[in-house]
């Protein structure tokens, strides 16, 4: 399994994804689930959850189309992010369901979060489903999560709004990821994180973090300590007295 996050704020975008895949307790491997592309007038960040074979095939097709000048469509030629979402959706179903969308689409398909910016256009964030369709997040909850979402979602619900700073969004993403790592053995480090600041030509921060790395540990360790400190200040119930 995996856990991936995409956050959109007024200032930019934050993406995070784990790197663990497993097919049982005795078969655990590490694969990056993030693809980044910032060339020319566009920056695109993609994270994925689901069937590893399908995800890797989609990433390979994206890279092949970028390098093929005769390709009818690629990340280079899409006019906007809705077209990028549609393009990735078609690649998804092509590799998971070559005979057409059916029940295999859910079993063999993958889910993607894509986001970024094309010069002169707004920041964008989309989720692409195994069946090839796609959605944007709600304005009031400007984030998307895929994979093992139940452990890391509460902190996102409490913190993430359109007005949150991109720094706070990044810290929130790390805490969300750490909460999931602590509760689900199918999600594991290293953690890929990408930060894109609005209207910039390149990704601002892109790093693969282990839990011992300072950028990760100084946030997550302090969060754990502060939670315990606050917990100790709760008033006693009357029946405890």
Residue ranges and their predicted role:
Residues 13-14, 44, 122-125, 134, ...:
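Hydrophobic residues embedded in beta-strands of well-ordered beta-sheets
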Residues 94-126, 132-134:
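Internal active-site segments that recognize and position negatively charged phosphoryl groups
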Residues 175-181:
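Surface-exposed interaction patches
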Residues 125-154, 211-222:
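Gly/Ser/Thr-rich active-site loops/lids in small-molecule metabolic enzymes
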């Amino acid at each position: 399994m995996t856990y991936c996050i995409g956050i959109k704020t007024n200032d930019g975008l934050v993406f995070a994804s784990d790197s663990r895949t497993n097919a049982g307790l005795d078969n655990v491997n590490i694969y990056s689930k993030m693809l980044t592309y910032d060339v020319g007038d566009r920056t695109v960040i993609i994270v994925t959850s689901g069937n590893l074979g399908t995800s890797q095939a989609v990433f390979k097709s994206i890279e092949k189309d970028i390098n093929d000048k005769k390709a009818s469509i690629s990340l280079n030629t899409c006019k906007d992010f809705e077209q990028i979402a549609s393009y990735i959706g078609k690649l998804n179903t092509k590799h998971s369901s070559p005979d057409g969308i059916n029940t295999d689409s859910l079993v063999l398909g993958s889910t993607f979060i894509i986001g970024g910016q094309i010069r002169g256009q707004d920041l964008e964030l989309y989720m692409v489903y195994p069946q090839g369709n796609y959605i944007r997040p709600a304005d009031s909850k400007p984030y998307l999560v895929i994979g093992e979402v139940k452990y890391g979602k509460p902190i996102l619900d409490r913190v993430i709004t359109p007005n949150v700073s991109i720094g706070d969004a990044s810290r929130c993403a790390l805490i969300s990821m750490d909460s999931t790592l602590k509760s689900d053995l199918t999600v594991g480090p290293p953690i890929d994180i990408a930060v894109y600041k609005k209207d910039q030509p390149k990704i601002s921060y892109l790093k693969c973090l282990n839990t011992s790395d300072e950028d990760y540990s100084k946030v997550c360790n302090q969060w754990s300590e502060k939670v315990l400190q606050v917990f100790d200040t709760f008033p006693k119930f009357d029946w405890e007295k």
